[in-house]
């Protein structure tokens, strides 16, 4: 039932939209505040699991007219929008303290100031699928985990520990002190061909920004570089790395 009274303003960064993203957030145990579903989807079989999970977790569900969904800037919402608390970032120390389930070498992904939420979301999705222990991104000049990133990640942001740090170069130094080899993904000839790199070790893969790639200081901090021609090949690198470790 819709509660009477004035409708609160929406904080778009704290929304999760799309059937799959909301469903995965529920399955992962995220404490969603409420879920809005388009009134014309009340009998949609595709929502059966989502509604059952919401009921089990006591998440309020309300059915809204399409005018409600017109208020948000996201067009791919599929008539499903959840309101969530601010994204629960992990700490780097917690991520490093967690044992690998299968005993294989640790694997992290570090993003050096990527600003496109669709690229960040795609890397979150691939990193989670490849079995990464976590993903690190900077607090400034970078896309954080917002509604668009969650949608592009197709639910993976609910499962992959994600850390925000003040300084990427400093974080790389901390990772190396923790015994992790830091590998920069780079398009320059200076990099080792991906298939020839020894990646069977505790590893952090650093991915540079869409326009300028790895920052010079970040590149210098890396133990070595692997040659990747373009950002779209990051998925291949992550999947290759997961097979190596």
Predicted regions and their residues:
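Short amphipathic alpha-helix with an adjacent loop that forms part of the alpha/beta core around
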Residues: 95-100, 195-198
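Conserved small/polar residues in nucleotide/adenosyl-binding loops
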Residues: 240-245
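RNA substrate-binding interface of SAM-dependent RNA methyltransferases
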Residues: 27-30, 46-47, 52, 100-192
């Amino acid at each position: 039932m819709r509660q009477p009274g004035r409708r609160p303003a929406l904080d778009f960064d704290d929304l999760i939209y799309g059937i799959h993203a909301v469903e995965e957030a529920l399955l992962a145990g995220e404490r969603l505040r409420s879920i809005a579903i388009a009134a014309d989807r009340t009998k949609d079989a595709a929502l059966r699991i989502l509604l059952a999970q919401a009921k089990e977790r006591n998440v309020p569900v309300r059915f809204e007219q399409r005018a409600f969904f017109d208020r948000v800037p996201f067009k791919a919402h599929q008539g499903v929008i959840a309101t969530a608390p601010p994204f629960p970032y992990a700490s780097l120390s917690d991520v490093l303290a967690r044992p690998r389930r299968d005993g294989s070498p640790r694997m992290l992904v570090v993003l050096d100031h990527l600003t496109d939420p669709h690229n960040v979301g795609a890397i979150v999705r691939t990193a989670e699928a490849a079995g990464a222990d976590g993903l690190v991104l900077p607090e400034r000049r970078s896309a954080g985990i917002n509604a668009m990133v969650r949608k592009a990640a197709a639910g993976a942001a609910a499962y992959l520990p994600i850390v925000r740090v003040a300084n990427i170069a400093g974080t790389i130094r901390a990772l190396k002190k923790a015994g992790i080899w830091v590998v920069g993904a780079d398009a320059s000839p200076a990099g080792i061909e991906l298939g020839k790199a020894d990646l069977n070790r505790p590893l952090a893969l650093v991915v540079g920004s869409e326009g300028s790639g790895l920052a010079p200081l970040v590149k210098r901090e890396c133990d070595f570089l692997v040659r990747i021609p373009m950002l779209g090949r990051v998925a291949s690198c992550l999947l290759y790395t997961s097979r190596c470790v």
